[in-house]
Amino acid sequence: MGHSIYLADDEKSIRELLHSFLASDGYTVRSFENGDALLEAFRQEPAELVILDIMMPGTDGLAVCRELRSVSDIPIILLTAKDSELDYVMGISQGSDDYLTKPFRPTILLMKVRALLRRVEMDRGKTAAAVDELRYGDLRYSATENAVFCGSTIVALTQTELRLLSYMLKQPEKAYSREELLNAVWGFDSEVEARVTDETLRRIRKKVLQAGSTVSVSTIWGFGYKLKEAERT
C-alpha cells in the first residue's frame, strides 16, 4: 500500500481529477469536499501528506493547515485560485511546505508530492555515519532524536524548519545565500521560490527566541543569512 494522502477541495472536478491522478501513481488517497471533514478524518487516522485548497466553505485551507501543524509535522501543500503575494506568505506562515496556483498541471503536483515524501523518508533513514549531534551556543541538534534543543527545552520545529536549521548548524557562522539554503532543503528540482526561505527562517527565528536561546538568525541584506550568538556580558 502506498503513502496515504488526504485531499480537500470543494470543486468536485478538481478533487476527482487529482484523486485519480495520485491514486494511479500508487498513493492511497482520501478526498474531502471541505476542511472540516478532512480534520475529522485526520483525528481518527492521520495521513502522511495533506493537500488543501485555500478557499473552501466552512474551515478554510489556511485554518486547516494551522490546525494540522499544531499537532503534526507532515508535509502540507496548499492550492489557491489566486496568484496573490498575500496568499503565498499567509500559506507559508501557517506552516505549509509548498504551494500551487490554479490552474496547474497534475504532473507538477505529483512532482511536489514525490519530492516531499522522499525527503521525509530521507530524514527517517539517516545512517549511523551521519553526524549525530551539532552544537552552537545553547542550541543542540540531535539526529537520533530528530530535534533541536535549547538547553533541555525542545524547539518546536516542523520537519522543513528542522532541516533548514540543522543544515545551518553544520557551519553556524558561515554566511548562507538564499539560493544555497533553498537548494539544500527543497532541492534543485523544486519550484518553490526564494521567498519561502525568508518566511521559513522568520518562523525559526521566532521559535528559537521563544525558547530563550542566545542564538539568533541574522539577516545579511541582499545576500542571505547566518547564525549569530549573542555576546556574553
Question: Predicted segments — roles?
Answer:
Residues 4, 115-175, 179, 228:
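Short, Lys/Arg-enriched segments at the junction into DNA-binding effector domains
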Residues 31-49:
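Acidic, metal-coordinating helix/loop segments flanking the phosphotransfer/catalytic sites
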Residues 54-55, 82:
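The short loop immediately C-terminal to the conserved phospho-acceptor aspartate in CheY-like receiver
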Residues 66, 70, 75-135:
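Basic, amphipathic DNA-recognition helix from helix-turn-helix-like DNA-binding domains
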Residues 46-48, 71-75, 191:
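His-Asp phosphorelay/catalytic-motif detector in bacterial-type signaling
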Residues 11-30:
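Two-component/phosphorelay signaling modules centered on CheY-like receiver
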Residues 33-34, 60-63, 87:
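Acidic catalytic/metal-coordinating carboxylates
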Residues 147, 152-215, 221-223:
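Positively charged, aromatic-enriched patches within helix-turn-helix-type DNA-binding elements
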